[in-house]
Amino acid sequence: MKLKTYQKMRRFLTFGSLILFILLVACINNQSKPVREHMRDSVSQKGDKIASTHFTGTAWLQMLVNNDSTYNTSIGVITFEPKARTNWHKHPGGQILLVTDGKGYYQEKGKSVQFLHKGDVVKIPPNTEHWHGAAPDKEFIHIAVSPRTEKGSVVWLQPVTDEEYNRIIQ
């Protein structure tokens, strides 16, 4: 009798372990693959065309992380066509730009322009007036990280004039 009980218990544990293993594999596969695929798709797509008076030229935005009260951060991929650029603006919580492709410019008010290429990182202090955009001959793509959004939204200022922009490229 003890042998039969032992065999039943062993079968039950083996069967239970097998089911638990299958469930774990299914859960891991269902959670990890779609997240990776979603991120890859998001970063490789241009996103939505930005219809705003805060930009000169054509640019697209693909949001990766929408702002919320838990993380107080928004992250988006911005793609600028050649010559496209933002207006002068500032972020109460600062901003970080991670250049992923192309050739572009970044300038703080009263300072020289910085030329940006793939791999460059720009850390912009809070409330620093600046603009960024593409070179005249090449698309420009960067990931924009806006931390500490609880400090307030971006403050848009005047456009970067064609005269200002053209002075840079000469």
Where are these regions (language model features)?
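Bacterial N-terminal signal peptides that target proteins for export
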Residues: 3-16
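C-terminal motif of bacterial Sec signal peptides marking the signal peptidase cleavage site
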Residues: 24-26
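A short, N-terminal "cap"/entry segment at the start of jelly-roll beta-barrel domains
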Residues: 28-72, 154-170
